[in-house]
Each structure stands twice: as structure tokens, then as C-alpha cells.
Amino acid sequence: MTIRRLPILIIVFFISIITTAQTKDPLSIYRKERDKINALEHTKLKVSFDFKNKELDGEAWITLKPHFYEVSKVALDAKAMLIHQISLNNNNLQYHYDNKVITIDLPKSYKKDAAYTLYIKYTARPEKVVQTGSAAITEAKGLYFINSEGIDTSKPTQIWTQGETEASSCWFPTIDSPNQKTSQEIYITVPNRFKTLSNGKLESQTNNSDGTRTDYWNFT
């Protein structure tokens, strides 16, 4: 009798474990934040758009400091991008890129509170990003082109971004984590007929000779 009942008891035991795990209060689950090795200080961007290919051509100046320990490398999130150049003080740096994260070798070790600014020239390709979003935001491409070639006359042509929670790195290299804070400024170049909107204050608008306009937004 005991031998025959044993499998049933084991099955009930596992069902009980599964049920308990499924009904656990979500607020009681510990969700560890990402380790903070380098801290973002400031982000400066210059961006323009390829409407046909749904891509962004960008330059980024990213200022960081070691959070606590001395560092000789830095890892930046950058999803599905083409990386053209990475430099510091006009000297090109060695790096490894796996299509998700750029690991950059710094020219020396930096101690806590010693700031350094990386320059990165890149192309963002949001249509090649494969990560998924959430129930509320089903996609996580970070950068969205709406009717980019103006074919659908019932829709306006728009480009907009959505960075929560880790989708900003689909359109510019960064440490894409909610526990990072950065001041920012951005130069956005668009055809003259478009309006731009960004965080911060619109400091200037410059008309270019090719029929585009560069808007400078400052949030520092």
C-alpha cells in the first residue's frame, strides 16, 4: 500500500510547490538592480534620420565616472547598431561589440570621481532590434518611424522614441538601466517642415543649406 501511494504523494507535493510559487505576492519578490560600475554623468547627442531605411545617424559624447572602484573598461548597451568610431581625447579606442553591448578598453585606469568622455559615431537600426516589450508596450525598438516615406496620406510622418525601461540603447549607446541618471543635450537635424520635441529647453534652431534644420535641446 505504501509503495503504491508514494508516486501520488510526490505529484501532490510538486503541485503544491508550483501553486505556491505562482501565487506569491509580486511585491515580496526581490528584484536586484544592475551593478553600478560606471556612473553616467552627461549625454550629448547629434542625430539625423534616414527616413527610407528607418535608421538614425548619430554622434554621442558620453561622460562617465567610476561609481566606486577603479576601472579600465566600460560596457555600454547598444542594440543592433553599426559602430563606426569610438575615441577618447581624439584617440581611437579598442572595443568589442556583440550587437548588444560595447565593451571598451580605456587608455588608462580611472579612479572614483575621475570623469572621462567617450565619443562614439554610430548608426542605429531599430528595425533590426529583436527584443520584445511588455504587455503595455509590445515592441521595444526604442525608435519608431511612422509613415516614414509619406506613402499613406491618412497618416502624418513621425519619428518618436520610447525608452522605458531599457530601450533607449536602441537609438544611442548608454548604460541602459533605471538606476542611472544623466543630464543631456541633443542636436536634432530634420527636414525643415518638421517640428521637434525633446526634454529640456529649445535653445536654438539653425537652418542648413540643404533644406534641413538643426534644433538644439538642452536639459542640464
What is the meaning of each model-derived region?
Residues 1-26:
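Bacterial Sec-dependent N-terminal signal peptides
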Residues 21-220:
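Acidic/His-enriched low-complexity segments
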